[in-house]
Amino acid sequence: MTTQASTKQPDVLVIGGGNAALCAALMAAEAGATVLMLEAAPREWRGGNSGHTRNLRCMHEAPQDVLVEAYPEEEYWQDLLKVTGGITNEKLARLVIRASSTCRDWMRKHGVHFQPPLSGALHVARTNAFFMGGGKALVNAYYRSAEKLGVQIRYNAPVDKLDIKEGRFVAAYVGEERITAKTCVLAAGGFESNREWLREAWGQNERGEWPADNFLIRGTQFNQGVLLKHMLAHGADRIGDPTQAHMVAIDARAPLYD
């Protein structure tokens, strides 16, 4: 079957279990490749931070199914500039913005449902398409589709290190187990859950305090940045500002990880 099964060398090894990993696995399987996906979390916590999302911001030049009015490319781009403070890659950003207009058909093909516009909520129904059942339903739909397409999925399988020779992927290690593949997709998330790395990125304030010590992680506990740090050690280029984040106000009594 698909879960926790042994496998011959796959065409594609996908490391991660959230939205990006699932999309990569689904598209590889659609193209006829054999796929093995390694998810660090147990099955009940699968999906990374994608389980905490609820909608997709979509460009559209005219009303589209669950979207009202219009949300053109340039307005979307200007909104992105506001929230990033201008620290973004315009070429890649515009690629994503344009694709947001058409990706819902592919998502529906893999079992994702969108809820109709809510009465009195036109300000978000114009820009955002909401997943029926939220991010957890999105993740579950993709996992069901992946299993139907023959993607092998292993849970509780955190990758500790990669074997990289001359800039090329050779193998991944889950503990002492060595897993080879013809190609590898790294989609294992950032370092949002790594308190030590967050401290390093945010530093100390003028009172000598560490702001990151007060952070509560609205998301998975499994995004430790292990492979990100591994790739940086192997010469991968850094990009972006490590202090950029999507932050929200939550109850101070909330657990460290949600």
Locations of the language-model features?
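Beta1/beta-strand and adjacent pyrophosphate-binding region of the FAD-binding site
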Residues: 5-20, 36
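Short glycine/serine/threonine-rich phosphate/pyrophosphate-binding segments
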Residues: 21-24, 194-195
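Aromatic pocket-lining residues of Rossmann-like dinucleotide-binding sites
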Residues: 28
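Core beta-strand elements of the Rossmann-like FAD/NAD(P) dinucleotide-binding domain
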Residues: 7-10, 174-183
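Short, hydrophobic/aromatic-rich segments at coil-to-beta transitions
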Residues: 166-172
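Generic hydrophobic/aromatic pocket-lining and core-packing "Φ" positions
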Residues: 24-25, 104, 228
